Structure formats: C-alpha cells, structure tokens
Amino acid sequence: YSDDGTANKLLAGNTDKQQIWVDYIQAHNDRDLDGIATVKADDWEGYLPGGGVIKGNTAYIEFLKDWFASSQNPKWKVMWMIANDGAANGGATETWLTTGNDITFNDADGNQVTEHHVHDIQFVGNKIKRINVYSRLSQKE
C-alpha cells in the first residue's frame, strides 16, 4: 500500500533472482564471506526478527564472523520462493523475492534447534538492497 492507503499493484516477478538467493544461502553454509559480500549492495540493510538492524556490508560481515565462530553452527535450507514486483510510493517499480528458509543451529545447551524464517528480499539490479527477516520456532514433535 502507498502512504495514502491506496493499493499498489503486485505483479509476478523475475525468477532470475531466485538463483541469486540460492547461491547467497549456499555461500552462508560454506562460510564464504567474500561471496556473501559481493551479492549485497554497499548500503544494504537487514531487519532481524528480534528488532535488530544491521546496516552496511562491513557490519554484516563482522556479524557473520562472530556467528560463524560461535558454537551455534548455523545452516540454512531454502524451502520455497515467490518473486514479485510492485510499485513503491512515487510509482517506481521495486523487485522483491519472498522466501521460506529453515535455519538449524545449536542452542546454548548444545541442542539442535530449527527455526522457520521468511525473508523478504529487495533487489536493485542483481544486488540485495534490503532483507526483512521473520521467524518462528519449528513445531516440537
């Protein structure tokens, strides 16, 4: 929706961005910090489930270095993707990819935990400009 409350059209997006995301997630699983950095725009922003915000490639790479060095050992698996384009305020078209991803990591007690994440990813060209992350714990069987 626009700032005045009118609905913006949502269109099927370019599925070419899906492979960029798959490669980006694989770079995380491979701990390939250079590969991760090359996909992001310099002014990238990430909005985390707990309310945290990471701005810029350098800050994100430092965040990942610490996380990858921890005992959590995070691993991601892409479950689904939906590509969409839509008009933003002012009429410019934005390119987004919405993805469902499972992340598995070790908690403080060493137990393996799985969370289901939805990532809304904004692309500018072939670079990731913004990621909004939403999360819920996996159901216990």
Briefly describe each language-model feature range.
Residues 1-34, 38:
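Short, low-complexity N-terminal intrinsically disordered segments enriched in polar/charged residues
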Residues 7-10, 43-55, 70:
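A short gly/proline-enriched turn/hairpin at secondary-structure junctions
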Residues 24, 35-37, 44, 60, ...:
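Hydrophobic pocket/interface hotspot
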Residues 25-30, 38-45, 65-73:
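Sec-exported extracytoplasmic/periplasmic mature domains
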Residues 39, 47, 51-56, 79-88:
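Acidic helix-start/capping segments at beta-turn-to-alpha-helix junctions
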Residues 40, 97, 101-105, 119, ...:
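Short beta-strand segments enriched in hydrophobic/aromatic residues
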Residues 64-109:
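Surface-exposed, charged secondary-structure patches
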